Amino acid sequence: MKNNSCYSYFSGGPVVSVELTKEINEALNEALDEGTPVTCASIDTDGFPTMAFYGSTHVHDAKTLAIWVRDPSAGFLQRIVKDNHLALLYRNSKRKLTYLFKGTASILEPGEESLRVYKESHPGEQERDPDMSGRAVLIKVLNVSSYGKVIMEED
């Protein structure tokens, strides 16, 4: 697989505006099947970082990631109400890909867009929440790094 989305890092090219690529989309869609679920860091109520795996993480649009949180009472949802800044890490050694996404999260109310997030989530995640009792979270991506170098950033 070509590493086109890391062009800026490998070539020394300029940082570009956030535009989540086809390669990023494919990597995140296959992450759970490949045993490399996305790790998400958020800030707990005491101000400390905490981390969790989110196998439902996927590209929602060119500037947004989405997560389906199966448990509507999950601590993650409570944390992002207080502080919506997140970091999400994707690492796949076999693909030789690493992406660190930084952004801000918002919880969607139930409705059409929330249903879209559920339907676009990994089938295994849907099977664990067949009643769709969870909540959809959108992450506006502000910065993408790969191998320690910023490759995409919003103005």
Where are these predicted regions, by residue range?
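Binding-site signature for planar aromatic cofactors or substrates
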Residues: 2-155
